[in-house]
């Protein structure tokens, strides 16, 4: 299973996910409330360490944007509060999943992986919609043995 497939399947287990009728890759319909998407932004090599034998441990980080288009009318403070709570809830859920060790794993070492959902914010508004974005990152280690 690819990193994208893992993230997509895992996000679908969020208890509040049912608010999204569709969850796309690299797309979110900003005119239709109740959908979202995951936008992969790549892999970053954070650190590389080599031992005297040439074996290498790499700390990597995958980054994703999670976009959600939710219903919100102009001046609708109640709807805005519900949406903001949803954004906070998914961030707290990701944190809990990471801390309790039930988030998906990507590395091949016994080191604990860290998944973070951060900076959830209103991204854009449209006719009866509001698009929110959360930055998701996964930090993990991979070990490469020289044979």
How does the language model describe each region?
Residues 1-28, 46-147:
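Charged, amphipathic alpha-helical segments and their flanking helix caps
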């Amino acid at each position: 299973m690819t990193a994208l497939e893992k993230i997509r399947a895992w996000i679908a287990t969020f208890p509040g996910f049912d608010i999204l009728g569709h969850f796309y890759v690299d797309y979110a319909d900003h005119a239709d409330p109740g959908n979202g998407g995951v936008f992969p932004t790549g892999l970053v090599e954070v650190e590389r360490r080599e031992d005297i034998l040439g074996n290498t441990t790499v700390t990597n980080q995958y980054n994703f944007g999670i976009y959600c288009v939710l219903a919100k009318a102009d001046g609708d403070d109640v709807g805005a509060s519900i949406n903001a709570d949803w954004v906070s809830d998914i961030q707290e859920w990701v944190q809990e999943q990471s801390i309790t060790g039930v988030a998906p794993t990507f590395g091949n070492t016994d080191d604990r992986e860290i998944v973070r959902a951060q900076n959830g914010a209103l991204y854009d508004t449209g006719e009866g919609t509001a698009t929110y974005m959360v930055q998701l990152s996964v930090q993990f280690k991979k070990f490469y043995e020289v044979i």
